[in-house]
Amino acid sequence: MTREQVAELSLQDEFRLAGKRYEQGQALLAEAQRQISDGTWLWNGGDVRPLAASGNAFGEAPDGATTGNSYFFRAARIIERDGASGAAADLEPMQRYFDDKGWRSGSAKVGTDLEVRADTGDGWWVTWSVRPNGQSSIGVHSEAFWTNDTKALVRATSARDPATFPDASKPGVSEPFPEWSDPVRH
């Protein structure tokens, strides 16, 4: 949506739109996780709350985006796989997935980690990082989305989010995005 279209939305409308975007990111995360393992993944914090964007989101922030008028989502999971060593070969299953999807992707060495990342072409990025200790992580990150007031949207979400999440789960398990009608915590 354009900045002008978002300007016409109420906070409740933006909240519902953020929920749809959150669900899109969670579906992408689950699909990408399954390329590696249907087993148990460790959570790296909660996923529900939108984050102030501007230049913090993946991709290129739209002109005029600030931390006060844009937000993004990110979700990450960690897995330790038998035989994984942080070698380039550990990137191959995810790189194949990216190639099969036709997504623009690239790889890099980040400290001691190797990473491959892809732009889905519809506002999302997927990252897959492998480490020498055999631990690997997957991340899903949105590009910046417009909002009328980042703080108000974050507060509206946070006040309705019970902030509970599992320590670990299989792909497809996610925190439900709160409903506007959920009780507001103070």
Regions found by a protein language model. Name each.
Residues 14, 49-50, 88-89, 99, ...:
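N-terminal start-of-chain detector that recognizes signal peptides
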